[in-house]
Amino acid sequence: MLRAMIGGRVDSLPLNAAVAAALEPFGLQPRGWLVPDGSSAPRLKNGTVSEAICLVGHGGGGFWPVFQTWHEMHPGITDPLDAWSKAVIEPIAALLGGEAVFPSDRPWHPFQQWAMAAEGLKPSPLGLLIHPEYGLWHGYRGAILFGADAIAGSEPGKA
C-alpha cells in the first residue's frame, strides 16, 4: 500500500528528497541528517555499521490530524503515538533501503545527542531541547539508519 501511495513520488529522487517526499503525507519530516562516528555508529541488522542517520520527527502540529485519524481507526492501542510512528516510519525505511529505530525501543539510541549533532540544538537548563523555530512543539518519532548501499551516489542531507 505504501509503495502505491508514494512509490512513484520517491523512486527517482535523491535519498534526502525521497525521505522528505515519503514522510510529508504523514505530517512528518526529516529533522536532520548525520554521519555517525565509526565507533558509535549503530549497527544494522546485517551487522554492518550505519553510514547515515536521518532523524524523523515533527515540528509544529502538522502531523496531529493524520495521527488522530489513524488513532480513531485503532482504538485501545497501548502507546498509540509510538504505535503510529512505527506503522508509518518502518515501511518508509524499508521502501528506501534503510532500517527504522525508535526512542521507545531497546537498544536505546542517543536521540538527544543525534539531535544536537544533526540540528545544532542545545539543551536548556532543564535538559529539554528547544528548537529555535518550533520551541517545545517538536519531537523525534524515530530515525532511519542507512547502510553504504542505500546512500551510494547520494549525499544524505544535501539539497
Model-flagged regions — what are they?
Residues 2-158:
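Auxiliary alpha/beta "docking" domains used to position bulky ligands
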